[in-house]
Every structure is written in C-alpha cells, then in structure tokens.
A protein has these predicted regions:
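Short juxtamembrane and helix-loop transition motifs at transmembrane-helix boundaries
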Residues: 1-3, 23-32, 50-61
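A loop-to-helix transmembrane entry motif
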Residues: 4-8, 29-41, 61-65
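Membrane-helix boundary connector in multi-pass membrane proteins
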Residues: 24-28, 58-59, 76-93
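Residues within membrane-spanning alpha-helices of integral membrane proteins
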Residues: 8, 15, 34, 38-41, ...
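N-terminal signal-anchor transmembrane alpha-helix
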Residues: 1-22
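Hydrophobic alpha-helical membrane segments
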Residues: 11, 63-80, 97-100
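Canonical alpha-helical transmembrane segments
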Residues: 43-55, 77
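Juxtamembrane boundary at the C-terminal end of a transmembrane helix
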Residues: 107-111
Length: 111
C-alpha cells in the first residue's frame, strides 16, 4: 500500500466519518468532541501551511493544501469554538465536506 492509498483511507475512514457524524448529530455530540474539532483545526492549519511551503519550494502543486488552510481548518476551529451554539449551516458544510472527502478519496483509492 503506497502513501497516497494510506492518505485516502485516512480521509475516508477518519475524517469523512468524523465530519459525517458531526454534521448529522449537530449539537447532540459530547462537549469533548467540540474541543477535539477546535484543536484538530489548529493542527490542520499549521500542518498544511508546512505542506504548502514544502511544495512551493520544489515547484509542485499545492492547491489542495490551500483548500485545507482556507476552508477546512477555519471551519473546524469555528465549530469547535462555538460548540453547541454553532449555527446549523456550519454543520451542513461539515456534512458536505464529509461526503466530499469520502467521494474524492474513494475515487482515487479505487482508480
């Protein structure tokens, strides 16, 4: 199993599953999960900044990492910060991103 397959499985099982769960259950999740989302967003932000830097340095494409920095990380931090006071639209965006993650990575896993 190569690196890209591991990344795809990780996104399908862990992140896709987490985003679907939170998107469906909305505020009916334990408080610790909001804390997890908050810190996950921070980790995603800084990790993908590093990835953009390393890709720019060697002249490779980095658009997917920018997507994580601009959309996914701030969304996770916001939902984690607002907790049970999060607006429904942000849970729906998480749900959409969960389906997108599963679909995108599933497609490339089985291609």
């Amino acid at each position: 199993m190569n690196y890209h397959n591991v990344i795809s499985l990780f996104h399908i099982i862990l992140f896709g599953g987490l985003f679907l769960y939170v998107g469906i259950k909305k505020t009916n999740i334990p408080n610790w999960l909001f804390t997890l989302l908050f810190y996950l967003g921070i980790v995603v932000f800084f990790y993908h900044i590093y990835k953009v830097y390393s890709k720019v340095k060697v002249g490779k494409s980095y658009w997917i990492y920018l997507l994580h920095i601009i959309i996914i990380a701030p969304l996770l931090v916001w939902v984690g910060y607002k907790g049970k006071n999060t607006s429904r639209k942000y849970f729906e965006i998480l749900l959409i991103l969960g389906f997108a993650s599963i679909g995108y990575h599933g497609y490339y896993l089985f291609q």
